[in-house]
């Protein structure tokens, strides 16, 4: 049986969702895994459809990680570039996301010290290849089984837009909302639901961001949703 160290976060954020799906496949392939959780031991609160056997399995492979520690066992790490300079053992393979177009010297060095780096996009991989990194390739993400089409019928008369992701300047959240409002605002044929809560902002800061995005006007076809706690709730929204 092949052995693997898997170092990744288990939580409701984007990296956490990808980590859980990696674990699903690794378990299916019967890989002998030692789980090294980044951060908390494992927060499965968002994964309300996952059975208890899977949760118990992850707890078991996390509890045994130090007893099975071997520097020759390859490691698959799922994390940001910043923080991936720390490795488990001799051969670390990194899966990461990169959203910029100008890698820093530090980022290039971190990539070069990995055995191999898998990026989720071709553009990111090519960007680092141009900086002299020969140990990079592309592995696009697959489909998350938690998200699927539901048999329930929803309103077919209204064209529904969804904006999902933390409210951040780098994501141009405010600009996107205002662009949509300038084109479709108060038009009953269109609806926009925003799931953009940023847990790093307090309630007052978040409200200021919403007010600024709506230009302090009332619009009858835009909704700002509260944080959704489970993938099941997000799936309903996406449907």
Predicted regions and their residues:
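Acidic anion/phosphate-binding donor-loop and adjacent secondary structure
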Residues: 105-106, 142-158
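Short donor-sugar binding/catalytic loops of nucleotide-sugar-dependent glycosyltransferases
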Residues: 9-10, 164-168, 198-199, 228
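Extended catalytic core of nucleotide-activated donor transferases of GT-like folds
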Residues: 3-5, 44-127, 232-234
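N-terminal strand-loop element at the rim of the active site
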Residues: 10-13, 23-65, 201
């Amino acid at each position: 049986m092949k052995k693997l160290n898997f170092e990744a976060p288990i939580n409701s954020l984007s990296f956490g969702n990808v980590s859980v799906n990696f674990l699903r496949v690794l378990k299916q392939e019967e890989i002998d895994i030692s789980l090294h959780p980044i951060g908390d031991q494992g927060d499965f609160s968002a994964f309300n459809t996952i059975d208890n056997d899977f949760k118990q399995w992850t707890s078991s492979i996390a509890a045994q990680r130090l007893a099975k520690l071997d520097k020759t066992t390859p490691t698959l790490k799922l994390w940001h570039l910043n923080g991936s300079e720390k490795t488990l053992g001799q051969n670390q393979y990194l899966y990461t996301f990169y959203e910029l177009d100008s890698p820093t010297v530090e980022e290039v060095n971190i990539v070069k010290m990995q055995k191999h780096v898998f990026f989720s996009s071709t553009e990111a991989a090519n960007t680092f290849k141009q900086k002299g990194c020969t140990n990079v390739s592309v592995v696009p993400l697959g489909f998350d089984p938690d998200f699927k089409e539901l048999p329930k019928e929803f309103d077919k008369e209204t064209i529904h837009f969804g904006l999902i992701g933390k409210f951040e300047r780098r994501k141009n959240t405010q600009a996107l909302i205002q662009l949509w409002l300038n084109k479709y605002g108060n038009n009953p044929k269109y609806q926009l639901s925003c799931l953009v809560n940023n847990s790093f902002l307090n309630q007052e800061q978040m409200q200021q961001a919403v007010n600024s995005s709506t230009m302090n006007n009332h619009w009858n076809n835009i909704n700002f949703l509260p944080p959704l706690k489970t993938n099941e709730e997000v799936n309903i929204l996406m449907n």
